[in-house]
From Swiss-Prot:
Gene responsible for this protein: SLX9
GO molecular function, one term: G-quadruplex DNA binding
Main localization, broad class: nucleus
Keywords from the named record: Nucleus, Ribosome biogenesis, rRNA processing
Subunit structure: Interacts with the 35S, 23S and 20S pre-rRNAs and with the U3 snoRNA.
Segments of this protein annotated with the region Disordered: 1-58, 105-125
Keyword rRNA processing: yes
InterPro entries attached to this UniProt entry: Slx9-like (IPR028160)
GO CC, any one term: preribosome, small subunit precursor
Compositionally biased spans, kind Basic and acidic residues: 42-52, 105-122
Name assigned to this protein: Ribosome biogenesis protein SLX9
GO terms classed as biological process: maturation of SSU-rRNA from tricistronic rRNA transcript (SSU-rRNA, 5.8S rRNA, LSU-rRNA); ribosomal small subunit export from nucleus
Key word rRNA processing present: yes
Length: 206
């Protein structure tokens, strides 16, 4: 005699109940509105991450500067970049020709104003005319007479001079320049006619 299966009906009933509950749960989830707090806890950058990004950007900038990488020099060869940098350095140097032209313009303007004053004060005091002529008179200085044997345009290169590129040389050059500046200020020819003295020195150096 075969035994009867007593759990078949129970299993069928349990399966039906489970199916109904799953359908109900799905329907409830679909009917619920979206959670308003779902996007409140987004990922935020911490202070350590910000510090790391700043440090990396700073290190990359230093690396680019040390390698000579510039956005304006991107895509050109190293020799062309060196030529451009050399040209920029040369443009920053003082141009003695421009100073000479400015001094000549100053002298022309002074002579023009003098001519006008002389025409207006032709019947004036003669002592005033003598003082004006003495102011505009160019007196040659004998201080730089030793440079007369050199050809114009020749530059005398002094060896074993302190270099401006290191700290010790720059300090020594500053001391020498201050001494030379004081000597120039105390020079009698420079005190009598400063523009004329500057013009003579520039013409000697050209």
């Amino acid at each position: 005699m075969v035994a009867k299966k007593r759990n078949t009906l129970r299993s069928k009933a349990a399966a039906g109940r489970n199916a109904k509950t799953s359908v109900l749960e799905d329907s409830v989830l679909n009917e619920l509105p979206p959670d308003p707090k779902a996007f409140l806890h987004q990922h935020r950058e911490s202070k350590r991450d910000k510090q790391n990004t700043k440090q990396q950007s700073f290190l990359s900038q230093i690396k680019n500067k040390s390698l000579g990488l510039d956005s304006n020099l991107a895509g050109i060869s190293k020799s062309a970049a060196r030529r451009r940098k050399r040209k920029i350095r040369d443009d920053l140097k003082p141009k003695m020709g421009e100073l000479l032209t400015s001094l000549e313009k100053e002298e022309d303007l002074k002579e023009y104003t003098q001519d006008q004053d002389d025409s207006k004060d032709a019947d004036g005091d003669e002592q005033m005319e003598i003082s004006i002529n003495n102011v505009t008179k160019i007196t040659k200085s004998n201080k730089y007479g030793k440079l007369s044997h050199e050809l114009p345009g020749s530059v005398k290169i002094k060896k074993n001079q302190p270099s401006i590129r290191n700290q010790k040389g720059a300090k020594q050059l500053a001391i020498d320049e201050s001494k030379r500046f004081n000597q120039v200020l105390t020079n009698q020819s420079f005190q009598q006619n400063p523009f004329g003295s500057l013009r003579e020195i520039i013409k000697m150096q050209k």
